[in-house]
């Protein structure tokens, strides 16, 4: 296959083993700032996916809470394939710390009593949320924390 412009289109989705967290890209700005983009893969590509209400609530919860653990977060957003998220950090390339930040954020999800910004004023599809769905996704991901380093299932 020809090399594509989008990094994830060059990833062989048939050989990765979810869950995992991998560095998906690095970009340096004109002034020396560096953005590191991580692929947080919750579900096995082409085998399973997150249901939209749970994914949507997980997005709100992670977007709000991850910033309590790092001031280096640029963005966190869901993948259209519904198997994971991308999180980008500026001037922060410590993979182990990124894992710690993700873990703390997932624990925040599990302790949440409501979904932030779950209303028509602050959300574009406020009817599509599930706190319980988000917690189920988060718990399954956290239960497999030992696998987050292992992108290709080599340790199994």
Curated annotation (Swiss-Prot):
<keyword id="KW-0456">Lyase</keyword>
<dbReference type="GO" id="GO:0043768">
    <property type="term" value="F:S-ribosylhomocysteine lyase activity"/>
</dbReference>
<keyword id="KW-0479">Metal-binding</keyword>
<comment type="subunit">
    <text>Homodimer.</text>
</comment>
<keyword id="KW-0673">Quorum sensing</keyword>
<dbReference type="InterPro" id="IPR003815">
    <property type="entry name" value="S-ribosylhomocysteinase"/>
</dbReference>
<feature type="binding site">
    <location>
        <position position="123"/>
    </location>
    <ligand>
        <name>Fe cation</name>
    </ligand>
</feature>
<dbReference type="GO" id="GO:0009372">
    <property type="term" value="P:quorum sensing"/>
</dbReference>
<comment type="function">
    <text>Involved in the synthesis of autoinducer 2 (AI-2) which is secreted by bacteria and is used to communicate both the cell density and the metabolic potential of the environment. The regulation of gene expression in response to changes in cell density is called quorum sensing. Catalyzes the transformation of S-ribosylhomocysteine (RHC) to homocysteine (HC) and 4,5-dihydroxy-2,3-pentadione (DPD).</text>
</comment>
<dbReference type="Pfam" id="PF02664">
    <property type="entry name" value="LuxS"/>
</dbReference>
<dbReference type="InterPro" id="IPR011249">
    <property type="entry name" value="Metalloenz_LuxS/M16"/>
</dbReference>
<keyword id="KW-0408">Iron</keyword>
<dbReference type="GO" id="GO:0005506">
    <property type="term" value="F:iron ion binding"/>
</dbReference>
<keyword id="KW-0071">Autoinducer synthesis</keyword>
<feature type="binding site">
    <location>
        <position position="60"/>
    </location>
    <ligand>
        <name>Fe cation</name>
    </ligand>
</feature>
<comment type="similarity">
    <text>Belongs to the LuxS family.</text>
</comment>
<dbReference type="InterPro" id="IPR037005">
    <property type="entry name" value="LuxS_sf"/>
</dbReference>
<protein>
    <recommendedName>
        <fullName>S-ribosylhomocysteine lyase</fullName>
        <ecNumber>4.4.1.21</ecNumber>
    </recommendedName>
</protein>
<feature type="binding site">
    <location>
        <position position="56"/>
    </location>
    <ligand>
        <name>Fe cation</name>
    </ligand>
</feature>
